[in-house]
Amino acid sequence: MACPNWRVRLAARIIRGGGVIAYPTEGVFGLGCDPGRKAAIERILQLKGRSISKGFILIAADFVQLQSYLLPLTASTRSRLEVTWPGPVTWLLPARGDVPPWLRGRYDTLAVRVTAHPLAACLCRTLGHALVSTSANRAGRPPAQTTLQVRRSFGSSLDYILPGITGKRAGPSEIRDGRTGQRLR
């Protein structure tokens, strides 16, 4: 189901066209694009000054949008996820072999999250698939928490900034290892 918010529909159209946007998440603004658009991923890497070896987070409106990227999960792993989703917890889960290295970096896992942020979830629903998510900041700088901070950091180098307010979380999402449950960030 698509979102009635015209700004979300505009953001989705830009992403489908290969664009890069900024949008609010649970704790900070994120930079996002279509996970299948390598040129858009490369643009984000250039904007942030980030290495491709780190990989990216994919956010989604629901787990179904993430399944095509992941190996089948055990019942106990699924249970761990369900307790934290939707929400600000990102899980590192075993990636399928055909997941491109520009998404997973140098790892055999992929960082995924079912977002609890209403605009971000609405954007994923409107797109009909998961969205690349990385904090809106240049390497070594703090993540943007407002539209104004995004504009100051990136100027006109983004195709669109989806206006909105971040969630109540202070800072980026927590990251956990899906195999062990261990908190990594």
Curated annotation (Swiss-Prot):
<keyword id="KW-0547">Nucleotide-binding</keyword>
<keyword id="KW-0963">Cytoplasm</keyword>
<dbReference type="InterPro" id="IPR050156">
    <property type="entry name" value="TC-AMP_synthase_SUA5"/>
</dbReference>
<protein>
    <recommendedName>
        <fullName>Threonylcarbamoyl-AMP synthase</fullName>
        <ecNumber>2.7.7.87</ecNumber>
    </recommendedName>
</protein>
<dbReference type="InterPro" id="IPR023535">
    <property type="entry name" value="TC-AMP_synthase"/>
</dbReference>
<dbReference type="Pfam" id="PF01300">
    <property type="entry name" value="Sua5_yciO_yrdC"/>
</dbReference>
<dbReference type="GO" id="GO:0005524">
    <property type="term" value="F:ATP binding"/>
</dbReference>
<dbReference type="GO" id="GO:0003725">
    <property type="term" value="F:double-stranded RNA binding"/>
</dbReference>
<dbReference type="InterPro" id="IPR006070">
    <property type="entry name" value="Sua5-like_dom"/>
</dbReference>
<dbReference type="GO" id="GO:0005737">
    <property type="term" value="C:cytoplasm"/>
</dbReference>
<keyword id="KW-0548">Nucleotidyltransferase</keyword>
<dbReference type="GO" id="GO:0002949">
    <property type="term" value="P:tRNA threonylcarbamoyladenosine modification"/>
</dbReference>
<comment type="similarity">
    <text>Belongs to the SUA5 family. TsaC subfamily.</text>
</comment>
<comment type="function">
    <text>Required for the formation of a threonylcarbamoyl group on adenosine at position 37 (t(6)A37) in tRNAs that read codons beginning with adenine. Catalyzes the conversion of L-threonine, HCO(3)(-)/CO(2) and ATP to give threonylcarbamoyl-AMP (TC-AMP) as the acyladenylate intermediate, with the release of diphosphate.</text>
</comment>
<feature type="domain" description="YrdC-like">
    <location>
        <begin position="5"/>
        <end position="185"/>
    </location>
</feature>
<keyword id="KW-0819">tRNA processing</keyword>
<dbReference type="GO" id="GO:0006450">
    <property type="term" value="P:regulation of translational fidelity"/>
</dbReference>
<dbReference type="InterPro" id="IPR017945">
    <property type="entry name" value="DHBP_synth_RibB-like_a/b_dom"/>
</dbReference>
<keyword id="KW-0067">ATP-binding</keyword>
<keyword id="KW-0808">Transferase</keyword>
<dbReference type="GO" id="GO:0061710">
    <property type="term" value="F:L-threonylcarbamoyladenylate synthase"/>
</dbReference>
<dbReference type="GO" id="GO:0000049">
    <property type="term" value="F:tRNA binding"/>
</dbReference>
